A protein has these predicted regions:
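Cytoplasmic helix-loop-helix junction between adjacent transmembrane helices
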Residues: 104-144
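Central cavity-lining transmembrane alpha-helices of secondary-active solute carriers
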Residues: 50-65, 275-288
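C-terminal ends and interior cores of transmembrane alpha-helices
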Residues: 81-95, 311-322
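Extracytoplasmic gate region of multi-pass secondary transporters
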Residues: 27-28, 223-286
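Extracytoplasmic
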Residues: 8-42, 244-249
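Helix-loop junctions at membrane interfaces in 12-TM secondary transporters
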Residues: 92-104, 162
Length: 322
């Protein structure tokens, strides 16, 4: 039985998000021996973490436009290849000083910024509407799976080898992914040589997206209330998520006198504490996606399903923070 091509698109996009996050969170653990070796202050560590987002916010803003214009396959593929090369180069830049690290982190952010706009552009053309919520949920689970893998494997590599090998090995994974992405994925379903006529018909009927997006003025976009609401929700979500991703390992490792838990990097408890949140995140992401699609199939209003599940996630997170 032939696997539908759109499922391969979902799997490869999941891997792209997975690689995006292992390359993003590896420094959250690697920074511990790096700070000790290079003598960086806590303020410098914070700047290193933040510099990534200077590049990220720029290409994330234009990533959707680029993907719609040149194809999601092209933008995501070359974005991932570039950030993988920047990951491999990170140790070399670290040995050339603090500002060199900031520079390579900005470049890494520039590469990673196109990830989410690109695969969303792909899904608008590849994924039938009734499958879209769970497809997005599965792909987004790459965030948590990548975080779990990144934290765990970074800790193991540092313990048995060195922090430099974290960046070398993770970067090479992206290069390998790029090879398979180029060979097996296309930006549009009708371009794929192995797609069946039945699958192509299903996609055309259930995901009727034009290859050329409609033009919309910036003023109209910025004054659109649903757009504003989604932007605020995304800001609040990402504020908590990225602080958590960046600082959780350091918080667990830092001495009690400095407000941390004082648990050593080579401790099993350290590994357990950094993994628990992401493991539960994987479960809730996938379950939430399937639940949403199930409710929509039962004729619940799409907007109500989105609002309820989003509110459960936000209020649940706020509750446990208190």
């Amino acid at each position: 039985m032939q696997i539908p091509v759109r499922f391969k698109v979902i799997f490869m996009s999941f891997l792209a998000v997975f690689i995006c996050y292992i390359d993003r969170v590896n420094i959250s653990v690697a920074i511990i021996p790096m700070q000790e070796q290079f003598g960086w202050s806590e303020s410098q560590v914070g700047i290193i973490f933040s510099s990534f987002y200077l590049g990220y916010v720029f290409t994330m803003t234009i990533g959707g436009f680029l993907a719609d214009r040149y194809g999601g396959k092209v933008i995501l593929g070359y974005g991932l290849l570039l950030w993988s090369l920047f990951t491999v180069l990170t140790p070399a830049f670290a040995y050339n000083g603090f500002f060199a690290v900031l520079f390579i982190r900005v470049l890494l952010g520039l590469g990673e910024g196109v990830t989410f706009p690109s695969w969303h552009s792909l899904y608008a053309r590849w994924i039938p509407f009734e499958e879209r919520t769970r497809s997005i949920a599965i792909t987004n689970s790459g965030i948590s799976v990548g975080t779990v893998f990144g934290y765990l494997v970074t800790t193991i590599i540092i313990f048995f080898y060195s922090w430099e090998w974290v960046f070398y090995s993770f970067g090479m994974l992206g290069v390998i992914w790029f090879f398979f992405w180029q060979r097996g994925i296309t930006s549009y379903p009708n371009e794929h040589p192995k797609i069946s006529s039945s699958e192509l018909k299903l996609i055309i009927e259930k995901a009727p997206t034009s290859s050329l997006p409609k033009k919309i003025s910036i003023f109209r976009l910025l004054s659109n209330l649903p757009f504003i609401a989604i932007t605020i929700a995304t800001f609040c979500h990402n504020w908590a998520l990225f602080i958590f991703l960046s600082y959780l390992p350091k918080f667990i490792n830092s001495p009690v006198s400095l407000g941390g838990l004082g648990i050593n990097l080579d401790s099993g408890i350290f590994i357990l504490l950094i993994l628990i949140p992401s493991i539960f995140s994987v479960i809730s992401l996938i379950a939430g996606g399937f639940l949403a699609d199930s409710l929509i199939k039962k004729k619940y209003q799409v907007i109500k399903v989105r609002k309820v599940l989003n509110s459960v996630g936000f209020f649940g997170s706020a509750f446990v923070c208190f």
